[in-house]
């Protein structure tokens, strides 16, 4: 593995849409007791189910710490590869590499700086040094060269692309004080265009209400395919989420993509607000410097936080009446893919969902 001093744009590489073909997908194994309740045992069972479900469609590799290797190997199916990989927590979408591809089928990793969603300003835990090495380790395992950005803090969940030159982000996240206060919006845009090789960036204002990542785009909007966007939605005008989604909807329906197409926007309805219970809160260790999980706190539940696999969609279930409607909408949006729901409250309790715990490797070399 080489660390390259050029850029994807200069080298003819682009970030593909998640709906394009994958070689495999990576997850990290949860274990920290100050984020996952009951010593992470319920979360581990859920992660194992997500991995097993995705393995119906593509190869799966799970990175685990030395402490958890034997346990994870026991809990995960035999067709899932388990590798030792130290980490601070299990959000590989955000700390893992963003892969870019060229027209010959070659791929490389982009290794952004990771600081736990805000560093010492409003980050969610400290330290995060092991997480910041995950992207390099994945590139090493995969035999892919990488681009390393020491001067830009970015998480994979804060970007979605259509593979044809258009990028979706939120101002709430990318312009937050804890990430890149030294850079202007225009400077951030210039770096993203260079390292994702996109031509147009659509800046939504905010993400899901109370999303602790400062409003990652992958929880509120996604490209189904070029020219078509799915958006998290509620009809409840008394919910703070309504104004956020409405502003994003009004922006998107009046936008064009990099190819000049008007965007088709599909609404994916949210479940009713989900709150942490007293029992769930008491199961999480209290540690200074880590975001507490308090009873009554509203969680950032969204069906948009799904994973697009080869031939399948793996989406979160919340034991809510909207689960069934989400399945119907996703089936309409992806008629050629199998739609599979996985009960995902345990991931939600940790601060994210299925898309947040996955990182795909594009097909090719």
UniProtKB/Swiss-Prot annotation:
Q: Provide the reaction this enzyme catalyses.
A: agmatine + H2O = N-carbamoylputrescine + NH4(+)
Q: Which domain of life is it from?
A: Bacteria
Keyword Ribosomal protein included in the entry's annotation: no
The EC number(s) given in the record are 3.5.3.12
Catalytic residues (positions): 356
Q: Which InterPro entries match?
A: Agmatine_deiminase (IPR017754), Peptidyl-Arg-deiminase_porph (IPR007466)
Q: Which GO terms describe its molecular function?
A: agmatine deiminase activity; protein-arginine deiminase activity
Its GO biological process annotations read: putrescine biosynthetic process
The family database entries (PANTHER family) matched by this protein are listed as: AGMATINE DEIMINASE-RELATED
HAMAP family according to UniProt: Agmatine_deimin
Family recorded in the similarity comment: Belongs to the agmatine deiminase family.
Indicate what this protein is called per its UniProt record: Putative agmatine deiminase
Taxonomic source organism: Latilactobacillus sakei subsp. sakei (strain 23K) (Lactobacillus sakei subsp. sakei)
Its taxonomic path starts at: Bacteria, Bacillati, Bacillota, Bacilli, Lactobacillales
- Gene that encodes it: aguA
């Amino acid at each position: 593995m080489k660390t390259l001093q050029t850029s994807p744009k200069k080298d003819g590489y682009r970030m593909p849409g998640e709906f394009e073909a994958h070689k495999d997908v990576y997850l990290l194994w949860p274990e920290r007791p100050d984020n996952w309740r009951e010593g992470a045992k319920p979360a581990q069972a859920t992660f194992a189910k997500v991995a097993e479900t995705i393995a119906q469609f593509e190869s799966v590799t799970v990175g685990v710490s030395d402490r958890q290797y034997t346990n994870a190997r026991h809990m995960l199916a035999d067709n899932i590869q388990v590798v030792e990989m130290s980490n601070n927590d299990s959000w590989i979408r955000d700390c893992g590499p963003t892969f870019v591809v060229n027209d010959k089928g070659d791929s490389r990793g982009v290794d952004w700086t990771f600081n736990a969603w805000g560093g010492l300003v409003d980050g969610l835990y400290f330290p995060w040094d092991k997480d910041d090495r995950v992207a390099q380790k994945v590139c090493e395992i995969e035999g892919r060269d990488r681009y390393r950005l020491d001067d830009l803090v970015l998480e994979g969940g804060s970007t979605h692309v259509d593979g044809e030159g258009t990028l979706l982000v939120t101002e709430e996240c990318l312009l937050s004080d804890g990430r890149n206060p030294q850079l202007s919006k225009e400077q951030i845009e210039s770096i993203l265009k260079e390292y994702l090789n996109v031509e147009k960036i659509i800046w939504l204002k905010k993400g899901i209400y109370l999303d602790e990542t400062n409003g990652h785009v992958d929880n509120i909007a996604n490209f189904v395919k070029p020219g078509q966007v799915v958006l998290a939605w509620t009809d409840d005008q008394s919910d703070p989420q309504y104004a956020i989604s409405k502003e994003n909807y009004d922006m998107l329906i009046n936008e064009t993509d990099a190819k000049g197409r008007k965007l088709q926007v599909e609404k994916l309805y949210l479940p009713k607000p989900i709150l942490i219970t007293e029992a769930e809160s008491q199961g999480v260790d209290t540690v200074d410097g880590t975001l507490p999980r308090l009873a009554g706190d509203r969680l950032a539940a969204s069906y948009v936080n799904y994973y697009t696999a080869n031939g399948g969609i793996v989406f979160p279930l919340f034991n809510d009446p909207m689960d069934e409607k989400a399945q119907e909408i996703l089936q309409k949006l992806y008629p050629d893919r199998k739609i599979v729901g996985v009960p995902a409250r345990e991931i939600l309790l940790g601060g994210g969902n299925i898309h947040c715990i996955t990182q795909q490797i594009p097909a090719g070399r």
